[in-house]
Every structure is written in structure tokens, then in C-alpha cells.
């Protein structure tokens, strides 16, 4: 039984082998190539065009035909396909069609693209382990256990990151995100979470549900001044939005639209090329590749030969992103099947739940595949099956159409490239031949009506610094302009409700393109409009009328010396007189014999009593004599130093007195903003709704807060314009707070006005533009060019230079202070110290001689002399007792007794002489 059994088993094996070859392989003996089958499930909508082949179905056939014609890719294999059509959102029909294709033995199923249908087909493919190829964005949960699929559409997290990088590159501080359905919030989650990490404010809006009319939403965004908008919608909806935005007047250079659809390049953008709108999008189709361009051209030729399509806003014959992704998907599956060896395909039944035994192996081949297709580099994540590595072109609308301006990739991020040479720039990249509306107001010398004998029209009506500046900018940038005066005549301020007025409001409402005027750049205005770099720097100061000359005081003779110096001179006078009195009493050489001819006189005299000492000091200070002459060296030192001191003081006083008598002092009641804040007699204010008023209103400095409280409490303190404020300053006791440049211009032409104090703050005048205006940077560069060429200074000299007022000398002679003549007090003090030391020496020396002569102890002699010297009322005392004297016939010359010589006498002689007699 063994042999028959073996023979039977061999026959059965040969039978099944032959059956498999006949079923799945084309016999080589007949010369037929190997055949593989793929399945495609595509949706169609109800209506008259329901049976018309859509782009995806055509791409499915197109790619299969390309592969079959190109034998280098599948040399021994023929690719066949099965196409099934289903209704949108019909997941049951999608399940049935998928089972039918699996029964035919397909190696992979492509589509469908709609969410619920995709999930149904994916579940079947995962159960039977057949690769499912997805081509549309689809949210894949983190806990998704389906592994038998790949998605060629870029990963939504990467796309969201690309949008965020683009927004950051554009330096947007605010934007509006408009999404079509709830899946848009998932696709844009990276951008929506940006405010928590980046300095950007987002406003989220949703397009109308079940309606293509977006005009109410566009009107609301236009009213809200939302100029930077990100649209997450299909290309069909994008075409409708652009058409409706054009009708709403929103296709201007102030708007910037970003569309997340990868089919923006396929839209017919011809009507918007010269509108100035900033239109940015993404493209994954690699049109720069020559091979891709050839395939796209073949596709276009076939599509143009097809039946004409209804108006859809698309370019004729253009290859959409879905078609390109499907083309790449078919090629990847074909290449992977060619690389797989000894892999057979059998019919699969959905109700039997028996998977394809080669499905896992084939799925791994697909996930590990790397391919350069129409959409660039294709690499899948081996775990999730998502396409996370790809390149996105950043495209922008220019005059010549859409142009590639950058590239984004998950690895390298965003790289903005320069505009290629020879390609047309965006209409807003150049101001050449553009006509701009310029808003301004009358303000001398910036903008004034031109004086002329004939009637002037248009821009010729105006002249001034800003007009010359505008002409220079127009010459550099090549634009033309129309000047319009602002309706309310105001610069622009924000009320309590947040509403703006003046030129700022006209820029916000896009009634003007530029505001060329002395418009101050402030933090509050920067939130509403954009500014160029300042063309003039300045600050707030005080305009006040010049003070009249004041009558001198009856005590103005005291002004040459400061009060401190007068006090110090008085103290020095008192001190020197007292020291002179004390030293004169202590010094023995200051005592003299009042009667030198009377040898019996026992009394010596001292002229420097307390009153005489004061009289001596007063006579020296007044440059008059006192007939009191010091005799001792110590008292002469005091006298000499005091005379030197009085010489310097009197000379300085005389010199400074001349300045005070010849120069009339001009005194102003205020010298600074602090002086204004501390008083209420002089009323002060600023131009209403101007930058100066806003500065005081927003300031947190206590002085300025106090000033604003004063101005706001008195409505009359604020003036309508500068002319009213100047007239009020001239006629009333009023100070006008205004820009220093205007004060400089006014004081050059009105000599009765002057600037009080320095600058309170520092700021600049800039040219205002609407928020997000493409002209701002161009204007800034032109201003910097004018500054480098010194033309801004030349223009200012032209308009600020007037007849001028005679320059005033410094009319305030400063009183001499201790810093200037303090040294003379030091010399005086040193002289006093020296005289005291000399007096002490004289005192000790003389008393020692007296003690020896009278044969007394030195200490007792000193005590007696000190006791007498401290008796201030007495000017006479007994002279020291000399030795016993005898008469002689000799005549004694009194030149040897200098200490007894009377003042004014050179010598004395007596008829008798005395000689010492010793016992």
C-alpha cells in the first residue's frame, strides 16, 4: 500500500500545482507575461456628472498604462486593475466593493478617500492582511492597531508645523485661522497651541456649514480688520473664497492669505495676479524635476483631450495632488511586488477571515520602500505607515503667477529662498508705478498751503517739509501719490471705547496708504498701525512767552556775593578782631611806654583794646586807615593776612558788582516741568488727541501724572491745534506743551516766545502705514538713504531757518560762591594760626627775661602776666622794675630802646640820662 499511496499523493500535488499556475500565473509556454492585479475604489457624487471619470480614477489608469508601457520597471509583468465606484459616505457599499476586489485576488487596494469609507475598507484589509493604500489626510489615533496600510499624504503634524514655521517667518503677531470642518482643528493643532509658546494672538473661525457662501464671514473679518488669515479648506472651497474676497474688496496688498490645501497651484489665479494680495500656499508636486515635468505634460495632454468639465476654478489639464500621490502609490506597489520573490496571490473571502499568507511580507516591503516620485522623496514610518519625511515648496503669487519662494522639510525646517532672476516680483515688492493715497494735516512747517497768485489744484496746493520728504520718497521708489487732508484734522488718538480718530483711523480703515505728517511714533499707535523708521527725532518741551525785565531790589548791592560768603566774611571779621585783641595783650612787644621821657614812669600801654581791634579790622575791610599800627611780629602777621584777605574780597566784589549793575537780569516764573506742576497760577496744556496729550495721559511718573490731572480737570487747558495754543500763549498766562521741533520753528519767527527747560522725553516722527503694509520696509530704506545723503538735514534747514531773533547773552551774572574764593579764607586761617604761635613765642621769651631781671620764678611771672592779660578792661600796667639807676652827664640815645618808642617818632633825647646802678 505504500507505493500506491505515494503515487496518489504525487498525482494530487501535480494537480494542485497545475491549478495554481493556471489560476495565478500566465504559462511561459504561451509567451504571456506575469500578471498582477490591483484594486481601486473611488467615490462619485450624485448629479449629471456622476459617471464622469474623476481625476483619481484617471490617474489610476494613467499610472498603470505608464508602467505597462515602460518595460524597465516591470519587464515580465503586466499590471491590471479593477475599479469600483461608490457613493460618498456609503461605507456599506465600500465594504462590499472591497470584498469583491479581494475575491479577485488583488495585491493592494487604493482608496477610497472619504473618512468613514476609508475606515471600513481599512478594517477589512487589516483583517485579511492585504495592503491598503491611502491618499488623503486621515487622523490616525495613537492606539490604532491597524498595521496593513500606508498613507502617502504628508503627516498632519508635520504640515501643522510647516504652517507654524511660515507664520513665524512672516513675523505675524496676530492671525485668524478659518477651518472648514472639525478635522481642521486636528490638522492645525500645532498652530493652535502656538499662543502658549510664542508671542502670537490667534482668532479661530469656522466656514459656513453646508454653504459655499463665505461673504458674511469675510465681511465680519473685514470689519474686524483681520488682515492675516489662514484658510484650512479644500481647493474647491479655496476657489470660492478667493472669488468672494475679490467681490468684497479684500484682494489688496494689505491682506495676506495662507491656504493649507496642497492644490493651490492648480487654481486659476489669473484674476488676482495684479491685485496686490499676498497669497501663500504649499505644494508637494516636484515640478522642478525634468522627469516629473514630462509626466505632468503627458497627463495634461490626455486631460485636455477629455470631455470639458464644468467650471470649477481649476486650470485646464492640471495634475492635482491626489492624482500625483496615486501615481506614486501605484508605482511603489508595482516596484515592491517586482522585488518580492516566490509570492503568490489567492482569492480571499471576507466571510472566511482567512488572511493572505504573504500579506505581512508584502506590507513590510512597501513600508521599507524608498522612491523618488512626482511628489518628491517618499519614505514611510515603519511603525505607523505615515509619510513623515517629505519636502514642501512654499509658493507665493507674483505678477507672473505662482512662484516658489522657499522649501520646508521636517528635518531642515523652513528655508526662504530669494526671488529667482528673470522672474516677475510680487506687485507689492516694488512701488514702481503704484498710485498711493497720502493722508496729512496742516501743520507749519511740515504741511502748509502754498501761497500763489493763481488757483492751485491737487498736490500743488501744498508745500512744507513733509511735502519735500514725500517728493524725495516718490523719486527714489518710483510711485505717484495723491495728498488728502484728514477729515477731522487730528493726528489720531484712542477714546475710552478703543475707537481711533484722525489719520490713524484712516490708515486702519484703509482710506489711505501713507500718513506723511509730524506723526509721533508711540506704543499705543504701534498696536494699530505700522511706522517707518523715524525721519526726525524730538522731545516734548514747554513753549512760553519771554519774561519782562524786573526792577532791581534796593539791596541788589548784596548780589555779587552769595549769602554764604557774606556770612563767612562777617565771621572772619569777628574772629580776626578777637584774635588780634588776645594776641596783642599776650605779646610783650605790643606794650609800650607811653611816657618814655619820664624815667620814673612805671606804666606801659597797649593800644589794641577790644574796640580798637574791631576798628582796625573794619578800617582794613573798608580800605581805610585806622591809625592803629601793630608793633609785635605776631600782630603784624595778623594785620598782613587780614589786609590780603580784604584785598581779594573787595576786588572780587567790585568785579562782580560791575556785571550785576550792567546786565539786566531776566527772571522767568518757571524753569522746568516741575515748576509747572508745583503751581496753579500759570495754566498749561497740550493739543487735544495729540501724541503729547497721550504721553501725559499714559505716563506713570508722578510729576507728569499730576500735570495730566490738572489738564484733564480743566477742559480749557487742551487746545484744538497748535495755532490756538500759540495765540493763547501770547495773550494769556498760558504754557503750551508741544514737540521741540515745532517750538524751534515758532521761536525762530516769534521773538516773544521761548522754550522753557530741556526735553521732557525723547521720541520721533515716522511715516504711518496700515498694519501689515508691504510698503513700510521700502519707505524705511528710502528714509535711511535720505539720512545718509544728509538730505533730511538740508530740508530741515530750509524750512526751519527764519529771519531769526537777536541772540541773547547770558543775562544772569552768578554770585561768587565759596568754591571760587574759598582759598582766601584758608590763607586767613593759616595767618591766624601763625600769629598765635609767634605771640606765644614772644610771650615766653619776654617773661623769661623779666623773671631773670626781677629775680623771680618763671612760673609766678607767667601766672601774673596771664592774670593781667585776661583782665580785658585795662590798657595800662606796671612795667618791669629795672635795676637801680644813677644820673650821669652822658646823653643816652633812645634808639636802643625800640620797645619804648612812640609811634611816628624815630628817636628821642632827654636832658638827663639814666644809668644802671647795682647795689
Curated annotation (Swiss-Prot):
Kindly report every residue range on the membrane side named Cytoplasmic: 585-636, 842-919
User: Where expressed (tissues)?
Assistant: Expressed in the olfactory bulb (at protein level). Expressed in the deep cortical layers, dentate gyrus, reticular thalamic nucleus, mammillary bodies, pons, and cerebellum of the adult.
- Determine if Acetylation is one of this entry's keywords: no
Ordered alphabetically, the record's keywords are: Cell membrane, Disulfide bond, Glycoprotein, Ion channel, Ion transport, Isopeptide bond, Ligand-gated ion channel, Membrane, Phosphoprotein, Postsynaptic cell membrane, Receptor, Signal, Synapse, Transmembrane, Transmembrane helix, Transport, Ubl conjugation
GO terms assigned for molecular function = adenylate cyclase inhibiting G protein-coupled glutamate receptor activity; glutamate receptor activity; glutamate-gated calcium ion channel activity; glutamate-gated receptor activity; kainate selective glutamate receptor activity; ligand-gated monoatomic ion channel activity involved in regulation of presynaptic membrane potential; transmitter-gated monoatomic ion channel activity involved in regulation of postsynaptic membrane potential
| Residues given in the record as L-glutamate binding sites | 518, 520, 525, 691-692, 739
Q: How does it sit in the membrane?
A: Multi-pass membrane protein
Q: Which residues are glycosylated?
A: 70, 76, 278, 381, 415, 426, 433, 548, 551, 752
Disulfide topology: 99-350
Q: Name one GO biological process term.
A: G protein-coupled glutamate receptor signaling pathway
Q: Which residues lie on this side of the membrane: Extracellular?
A: 32-563, 658-820
Identify the domain of life: Eukaryota
Q: Which reaction does it catalyse?
A: Ca(2+)(in) = Ca(2+)(out)
One GO cellular component assignment for this chain's record is: axon
Misc: The postsynaptic actions of Glu are mediated by a variety of receptors that are named according to their selective agonists. This receptor binds domoate > kainate >> L-glutamate = quisqualate >> AMPA = NMDA.
What is this protein's record name? Glutamate receptor ionotropic, kainate 3
Query: Which species is this UniProt entry from?
Result: Rattus norvegicus
